[in-house]
Every structure is written in structure tokens, then in C-alpha cells.
């Protein structure tokens, strides 16, 4: 099913490309927040199991994907700004659920800390409150390559680290995507990494402790960058936190293989629809089409 697309102006400053996958029978709308260099295409597999149950909203950040031509992109934007964009889109689409992937979790949690009245539940995938040695090494290497605008090294870094468990087909498209971005996108990622490195435990405690809605944190068993164990530290900050580990999966969980995709679908729907009837089961079928292949990001 093709989505309805639109360019939405936010705060008179940003123009955001959105995709709306409508379901006439759905009673709720879920908005998905991708990573820093990812686009709406990164959620191609996720939409397959969500759209039979929900209205689904995807969007590109102002500096990325199909939003990029509609914005000047002279100055990097902060995660706080991304959180404000998300809050506005939640209102525009009347979303009740938000779900993020990897570093999209920062903007999502910052937005949830504002206690948006519409949101009833949230899911955060492949994210942790702790920057462990593996993640720090990845980020510092990324800073060097981004500062030099070394496209080949940036593409290789993603595939060799957080993307190590992706199928080869996805790795090829991943490399093509990450190594062919505009320079302002690399500058944006460099800015975001520096933001992330300045975060500390106190910042998380102060910002996120007020979140009171039920939340599910999902991480891959094999992910050494945002580990399931470290993600559980959110339980000390967020009262309604639940946790689920996707077996035999790395950072990109549901796009890595069929079993991980099914586990992610089952855990997500069990959390969002605890009284649901037997869900529809779409088919996991990686697409050999660049437009629909999930794309990684340097810090996703």
C-alpha cells in the first residue's frame, strides 16, 4: 500500500516530509522516529507488521531524505529541536504511540519528558542510557571520519560495527546510502555525536525520570553497542519501563533475519495490544529495491 505523502511546515522554520499509511479499521496511530542519517526507507520491514493494526506515520528529519530539498540546512539542529518537531507531528497526526530506533531514542525520550497528553505508550529500540567502551570507540572513530568527510571510511565503519549482522544485500545498500550523503548531513552527524558525548547520567535522570507512560525497550542479544543489560538501567529512571531481548540479533534487530523480525513483531504487538486477537502475519521479504531497503545510519 502506498502512503499518503505531505510536506508539513513546523514552527514556520522546517518543512518535514511525512508518509501516512492509513488503516480504516485502526483505532490508534503510531509515529516512528528513525536515526540520525536514516530515512523513512529504514522502516520498510517495520511498516509491514504495524500497518495491519495501526495508522503508521513516518517522517524524515529536516536535513535528511525527502525533507532535505525543502530546507536550507545551513546550521545543524539539536536533539531538543528534533524533540520539538516530533511533538508537533504527534499533535498533527493525533498519534497515541511513538516508536524510535537507536539515536532516534534521544529525541523521543526528550519529547516524552514533556508528557505529551496524546501519547499512551512508547517503544524504544536499540538504545541505552550508557555509552560503553564499544560505543565510545565507534563514536570517536566516526567523529574523525565525519570531520574529514571520508565517505568510504564512514560507510565501512557502519557496516563493520553496528551493521555487522545485516544481510549482505542490506550492507551494500547501506554503504551506498551512507557514503553518498551531502556534506551537511555529515556535519549534522558530527554535531549530534558531540551532543551525545556531552550527555551524562544526571542529564538522563533529570530529563527522563518524569516519564510515566508504559514503555518497552527492545535490544538485540548480540548488540555490544547498546546492550540489553545496559538498557535495563532505564528501569531506575522510568517507572513504567519494560524490557525485551531479541535473540540472536544485533543492533538492527528486525531487519537482520526472519526470526528476529518475527520476535520483534510479536514482542511489539504483545506490548501495544495486550488483549489483541491473533495478529495478521505479513511475510518477511527483503526487497532488492534501493528505495525500500532499510538503511543504516552512523549512529542511527
Swiss-Prot record:
Molecular function as annotated in GO: pimelyl-[acyl-carrier protein] methyl ester esterase activity; transferase activity
Signal peptide: none
Pathway(s) the chain acts in: Polyester biosynthesis; polyhydroxyalkanoate biosynthesis
Record SUPFAM superfamilies: alpha/beta-Hydrolases
GO BP, one annotated term: biotin biosynthetic process
Pfam family, one: Abhydrolase_1
Keywords, ordered alphabetically: Transferase
Source organism, top-level taxon: Bacteria
Domain AB hydrolase-1: start-end pairs: 29-253
Alphabetical list of InterPro entries matching this protein: AB_hydrolase_1, AB_hydrolase_fold, Carboxylesterase_BioH
Enzyme Commission number(s): 2.4.1.-
Annotated function: Catalyzes the transfer of the acyl moiety from in vitro synthesized 3-hydroxydecanoyl-CoA to acyl carrier protein.
Protein name as annotated: (R)-3-hydroxydecanoyl-ACP:CoA transacylase
Origin species: Pseudomonas aeruginosa (strain ATCC 15692 / DSM 22644 / CIP 104116 / JCM 14847 / LMG 12228 / 1C / PRS 101 / PAO1)
Phylogenetic classification of the source organism: Bacteria, Pseudomonadati, Pseudomonadota, Gammaproteobacteria, Pseudomonadales
Amino acid at each position: 500500500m502506498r502512503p499518503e505523502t505531505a510536506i508539513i511546515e513546523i514552527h514556520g522554520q522546517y518543512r518535514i516530509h511525512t508518509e501516512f499509511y492509513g488503516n480504516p479499521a485502526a483505532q490508534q496511530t503510531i509515529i516512528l522516529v528513525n536515526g540520525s542519517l536514516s530515512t523513512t526507507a529504514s522502516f520498510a520491514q517495520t511498516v509491514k507488521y504495524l500497518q495491519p493494526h495501526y495508522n503508521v506515520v513516518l517522517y524524515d528529519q529536516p536535513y535528511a531524505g525527502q525533507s532535505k530539498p525543502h530546507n536550507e540546512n545551513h546550521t545543524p539542529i539539536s536533539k531538543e529541536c528534533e524533540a520539538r518537531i516530533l511533538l508537533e507531528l504527534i499533535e498533527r497526526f493525533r498519534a497515541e504511540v511513538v516508536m524510535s530506533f537507536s539515536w532516534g531514542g534521544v529525541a523521543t525520550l526528550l519529547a516524552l519528558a514533556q508528557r505529551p497528553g496524546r501519547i499512551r505508550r512508547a517503544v524504544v529500540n536499540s538504545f541505552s542510557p550508557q555509552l560503553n567502551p564499544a560505543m565510545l570507540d565507534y563514536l570517536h572513530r566516526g567523529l574523525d571520519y565525519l570531520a574529514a568527510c571520508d565517505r568510504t571510511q564512514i560507510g565501512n565503519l557502519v557496516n563493520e560495527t553496528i551493521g555487522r549482522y545485516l544481510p549482505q544485500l542490506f550492507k551494500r545498500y547501506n554503504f551506498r546510502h551512507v557514503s553518498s550523503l551531502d556534506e551537511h548531513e555529515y556535519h549534522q552527524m558530527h554535531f549530534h555525536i558531540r551532543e551525545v558525548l556531552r550527555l551524562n547520567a544526571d542529564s538522563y535522570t533529570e530529563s527522563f525520570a518524569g516519564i510515566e507512560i508504559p514503555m518497552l525497550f527492545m535490544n538485540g542479544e548480540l548488540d555490544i553497542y547498546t546492550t540489553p543489560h545496559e538498557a535495563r538501567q532505564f528501569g531506575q529512571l522510568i517507572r513504567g519501563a519494560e524490557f525485551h531481548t531479541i535473540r540472536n540479533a544485533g543492533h538492527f534487530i528486525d531487519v537482520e533475519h526472519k526470526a528476529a523480525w518475527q520476535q520483534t513483531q510479536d514482542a511489539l504487538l504483545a506490548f501495544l495490544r495486550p488483549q489483541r486477537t491473533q495478529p495478521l502475519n505479513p511475510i518477511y521479504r527483503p526487497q532488492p529495491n534501493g528505495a525500500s531497503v532499510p538503511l543504516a545510519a552512523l549512529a542511527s
